UniProtKB/Swiss-Prot annotation:
Leading EC class: hydrolase
Name of the gene encoding the protein in the UniProt record: treA
Pfam families membership: Trehalase
Active site: 312 (proton donor/acceptor), 496 (proton donor/acceptor)
Annotated region (Disordered), positions in chain: 539-565
GO cellular component, one term: periplasmic space
Quaternary context: Monomer.
Alphabetized SUPFAM superfamilies for the sequence: Six-hairpin glycosidases
Binding-site list for substrate: 152, 159-160, 196, 205-207, 277-279, 310, 511
Protein name: Periplasmic trehalase
């Protein structure tokens, strides 16, 4: 048996070092030149804890978004002085000292709108700005207007926005796409990264890194000028995700970076804090208390890191799918995250070349090639025949098939034969009458069966098309669009997630009621409508009968549901 060349790990380590050392200073500079706003649990200390534990509001996010009417230190001092007095009323104290978030206005669409007309009419309804942000507001100011998901949310979210922007582009709103890219670039320049959302309590983590793909989308309209303009911010974001890599030894992890024993560099999700999330304070405390065998701080970090993944929550992160307290997000190397990092490296190479820096472009290409090899080596389950996450504790690829397995196809990082196997696995295990299942496990969590989410439908559709698997790709689009149309026909809204075991039903689970709006569903629906309908005959609703495609000779109806575990 051939033994591995001893110099290979060192060589792999040296390749990125020159880039990471060049750009590490960029993220540090952003942190040093801005005063990072403190989240409400730090600003208000025991008052915040007491209000959340008292459950004064049905949604823990309400008080996390409340705006102090004066200096929080003064409010806290008043609270300490008054709290033990006879007749003290905590709710009254909160009402006097805080301005609570306003309920979002319920949008009643005009009657008789088609699906496309409904979505186009929603864009201005979902547009917000931070022009009137108060001094002590947890809402982080942004220079341009932005589109929120809808429903419960008053802030913009990172990875949601990419799929929303796909829809904005389809609707011809390139000005809004440009505004949102500018906002995210502003956050990178100000905070060193793009937070989960523009709230102070989201600053300790990011979300799936789609910024480079946003810039690439904008470049479809503005050309290479967009790539050159936002190259510095893309480099800063890359430095954030790779922060600490220059000092990593084989087998170690630091924040978001993982260095395996052979020197392979991959990434994981990570939150810099290990306390309950302000927006889910009581729930996180209860989850930690339910497992006394683990340190509470460890559970808090893994809960927060799962929120950073966008998949909050899923059996994907758990040892026991029925027990949230067994999640261990930080010891899992996700296949979707590393696919996005590969794509970021490829776009950085393209942008560097556009800027005339061929040497730097070659460096990023080298990093992308190394990561692609790492994905193929560590994130492919040969026994099962699909891509999966890598477990840092067992030092093995995990067995569970999830919709995240389609990300290597989405970014063109998959080997052709493996993409073909993924198509088979997708059709056999994940495709349902109402779209693509997130997993095949029923845990009660929202990122599990029977829920399907718009971004994952689009990633799968695009990924499979990239490898010539048009039939499965079109099956996913048709099934999901049918679900969206049936729900819209009944409820006159698009929702955050769908039950894909059938059609016409919104999804369940999660930490809050089902939301309507809905940014990323709007965007993906428009993209899929244009995919299934001929360009010469664009459709405003999902056709009653599936249009013929290259791979079909007659209209197809959705298949019957496959039993889930």
């Amino acid at each position: 048996m051939k033994s591995p060349a001893p110099s290979r790990p060192q060589k792999m380590a040296l390749i990125p070092a020159c880039i990471f050392l060049c750009f590490a200073a960029l993220s540090v500079q952003a942190e040093e030149t801005s005063v990072t706003p403190q989240p409400p649990d730090i600003l208000l200390g025991p008052l915040f804890n007491d209000v959340q534990n008292a459950k004064l509001f049905p949604d823990q996010k309400t008080f996390a978004g409340a705006v102090p009417n004066s200096d929080p230190l003064m409010i806290l001092a008043d609270y300490r002085m008054q709290q033990n007095q006879s007749g003290f009323d905590l709710r009254h104290f909160v009402n006097v000292n805080f301005t609570l978030p306003k309920e979002g206005e319920k949008y009643v669409p005009p009657e008789g709108q088609s699906l496309r007309e409904h979505i186009d009419g929603l864009w201005p309804i979902l547009t917000r700005s931070t022009e009137n942000t108060e001094k002590w507001d947890s809402l982080l100011p942004l220079p341009e207007p932005y589109v929120v998901p809808g429903g419960r949310f008053r802030e913009v979210y990172y990875w949601d926005s990419y799929f929303t922007m796909l829809g904005l582009a389809e609707s011809g709103h390139w000005d809004k796409v440009a505004d949102m890219v500018a906002n995210f670039a502003h956050e990178i320049d100000t905070y060193g990264h793009i937070p989960n959302g523009n709230r102070s309590y989201y600053l300790s983590r990011s979300q799936p890194p789609f910024f480079a793909l946003m810039v690439e989308l904008l470049a479809q309209h503005e050309g290479d000028a967009a790539l050159k303009q936002y190259l510095p911010q893309m480099q800063k974001e890359y430095a954030y995700w790779m922060d600490g890599v220059e000092n990593l030894q084989a087998g170690q992890q630091e924040k978001r970076v993982v260095k395996l024993q052979d020197g392979t560099l991959l990434n994981r999700y990570w939150d810099d804090r290990d306390t309950p999330r302000p927006e889910s304070w009581v729930e996180d405390i209860a989850t930690a208390k339910s497992n006394p065998n683990r340190p509470a701080t460890e559970i808090y970090r893994d809960l927060r890191s799962a929120a950073a993944s966008g998949w909050d929550f899923s059996s994907r992160w758990m040892d026991n799918p029925q027990q949230l307290n067994t999640l261990r997000t930080t010891s899992i190397v996700p296949v979707d995250l590393n696919s996005l990092m590969f794509k970021m490296e490829k776009i950085l190479a393209r942008a560097s070349k556009a800027a005339g820096d061929n040497a730097m472009a070659n460096q990023y290409e080298t990093l992308a090639n190394a990561r692609q090899k790492g994905i193929e080596k560590y994130l492919w389950n040969d026994q099962q025949g699909w891509y999966a996450d890598y477990d840092l504790k067992s030092h093995k690829v995990r067995n569970q098939l999830t919709a995240a397995a389609l990300f290597p196809l989405y970014v063109n990082a998959a080997a052709k034969d493996r993409a073909n196997k993924m198509a088979t696995a997708t059709k056999t295990h994940l495709l349902q009458p109402g779209g693509l299942n997130t997993t095949s496990v029923k845990s009660g969590q929202q990122w599990d069966a029977p829920n399907g989410w718009a971004p994952l439908q689009w990633v799968a559709t695009e990924g499979l098309q990239n490898y010539g698997q048009k039939e499965v790709a079109m099956d996913i689009s048709w099934h999901f669009l049918t679900n969206v149309q049936h729900t819209y026909d009944r409820e006159k809204k698009l929702v955050e997630k769908y039950d894909v075991s059938t059609t016409g039903t919104g999804g369940g689970g999660g930490e809050y009621p089902l939301q309507d709006g809905f940014g990323w569903t709007n965007g993906v629906t428009l993209k899929m409508l244009d995919l299934i309908c001929p360009k010469e005959q664009p459709c405003d609703n999902v056709p009653a009968t599936r249009p013929l495609s290259e791979s079909t000779t007659q209209p197809v109806k959705p298949k019957e549901a496959e039993p889930t575990l």
